Amino acid sequence: MIRVAINGYGRIGRSILRALYESGKRQQIQIVAINELAKPEAIIHLTQYDTTHGRFQPRVKLVDDQMLIGDDVIKILHEPDPAKLPWREMDIDIVYEATGAILDRNSCEAHILAGAKQVLISHPSSADVDGTIVYGVNQDLLRAEHTVVSNASCTTNCIVPVIDVLDKHFGVKSGAITTIHSAMNDQQVIDAYHDDLRRTRAAGQSIIPVDTKLARGIERILPHMKDKFEAISVRVPTINVTAIDLSVTLDKTVDIATVNQVLELAANGRFNGILGYTDEPLVSCDFNHDPRSSIIDGTQTRVSAGQLVKLLLWCDNEWGFANRMLDTSLAMIAAKQS
């Protein structure tokens, strides 16, 4: 049994906990502790009730600063300094670092000094970590000596498996990406101050361009794609599910049917459970709570002049990513034991 702790219990932290119980991986992973500065009553309430993902079916109780889920007991901590967390006494194998604020190796080492054996960051990190993993593509690079690993981003997890499939079958010369991302909690409900002037504006009233490092994230996973991609991102007034508009120029000449067939076969084969494929007339909310990293919308595939291909990809940017956090942590332990 892998003993884990969650540091930072926001959207991703709570999704990880809920995904653990829904995915069937509870027999492999035990959440021992949650470190979150919010009040315990709010922690319990937001675990039980969620506007996006609905009510959590197991009954959640608060007893003496402990979260009870059935027979499981999870200690709730409120320690702002990771170096002071009781990971050694709790025998923590992996910390899910989900604050969104601790993103480099040096900061994550505080968890290691506190006694955790490994750290998995739920965010793109600095380049000094031991590895950045997109599960399904490069988890085989994990090694026993790796202590600090990044799970990349939700959009990197969405797009990299698709690029990998296209490149292996047709060769990818270059690409351009537009991420159409749901609003996030770094935006404002009504106009208010923010360092990014566009994010001073009400999230529910505008389509808001934001900076993205997605192209650099692709390069980190697929180094041979360096300088081949550029990306932009806009936030839209929905609370969950993201679409990615991917355009790639291929080495080979293709048609729509060939591209869709290759992607559908990959979704049903090597990337089963990671990629999905649909030719139904669906909309974003139909992918809410979908555990896969990416779903290709075959109805929107387009080919121009035989080599320019446009795809539409969907992902639940919370739930799919949370499920990959679980998968990557299991792969980290497997590598450590090999």
From Swiss-Prot:
Enzyme class: oxidoreductase
Assigned EC number: 1.2.1.72
GO molecular function: erythrose-4-phosphate dehydrogenase activity; NAD binding
Pfam families found in the cross-reference section: Gp_dh_C, Gp_dh_N
Compartments, record wording: Cytoplasm
Function: Catalyzes the NAD-dependent conversion of D-erythrose 4-phosphate to 4-phosphoerythronate.
PANTHER family: GLYCERALDEHYDE-3-PHOSPHATE DEHYDROGENASE 2 (PTHR43148)
This protein's name: D-erythrose-4-phosphate dehydrogenase
Gene that this sequence comes from: epd
